Each structure stands twice: as C-alpha cells, then as structure tokens.
Amino acid sequence: MNILDKIDAASLRDDVPAFRAGDTLDVHVKVIEGTTTRTQLFKGVVIRRQGGGIRETFTVRKVSFGIGVERTFPVHSPNIEKIEVVRRGDVRRAKLYYLRELRGKAARIKEKR
C-alpha cells in the first residue's frame, strides 16, 4: 500500500449506507451562508453511482416545481452530514439516464419487496 492509498483510506467515511441506482435518498447537506451553517435536505432518486474509493460519486435527481434538478455528491464528502435510504427501488440498470425524458407517472420506480 503506497502513501496515497493510506491517505485515501484515512479520509473514507464509515457511516455511508448501502444504496444503488433506483433508491430514493434523503441527503442532508451542510450549507454555509456567511457566518451561519445550516442543513439542507435534498431528496430524490439515485440515477447513477460511479467511481471508487475516495473519488466515488453519486447523482440524485428530483423534480422541483416541474423542473428536473440533478445534483452530484462525492460519497465521502465532509459537507454531507448523513445519507438516509427512504425506499429501495427495483430497477435493472446501473445508470438511469432514461428517467430524464420521462414525465409524471412514467418516471416512477417500483419499490423492491
């Protein structure tokens, strides 16, 4: 194990739940506004999870006031307070880019039993 691997291993988080594409998450993000810090909730469906180790990221999509919003987070970011899995989705793909074109009820994902 070289020096960079040791540094990466030291900054990995251990409180990340197991989730994959299709799951609905609550991501609690720290937002700094001037001198105050608050927590902002971003709730949506995971459309992709990519990378590995310290560089691993995931993208969450939600529809806010009729407009699709996607946000990409590093899994091991210190700006994420916690990640909660709300629902497990039953999908057959690792990347759910096709959800971008679907509207309304067609964009729903079945819940895993």
Swiss-Prot record:
PROSITE patterns: RIBOSOMAL_L19. One of its GO terms (molecular function) is structural constituent of ribosome. The keyword Ribonucleoprotein applies. It holds the Pfam family Ribosomal_L19. InterPro entries: Ribosomal_bL19, Ribosomal_bL19_CS, Ribosomal_bL19_sf, Translation_prot_SH3-like_sf. GO terms for cellular component: cytosolic large ribosomal subunit. Signal peptide: none annotated. Keywords: Ribonucleoprotein, Ribosomal protein. GO terms for biological process: translation. The keyword Ribosomal protein applies. This protein is located at the 30S-50S ribosomal subunit interface and may play a role in the structure and function of the aminoacyl-tRNA binding site. HAMAP family: Ribosomal_bL19. NCBIfam families: rplS_bact. Belongs to the bacterial ribosomal protein bL19 family. This is Large ribosomal subunit protein bL19. The lineage of its organism: Bacteria, Bacillati, Actinomycetota, Actinomycetes, Mycobacteriales.
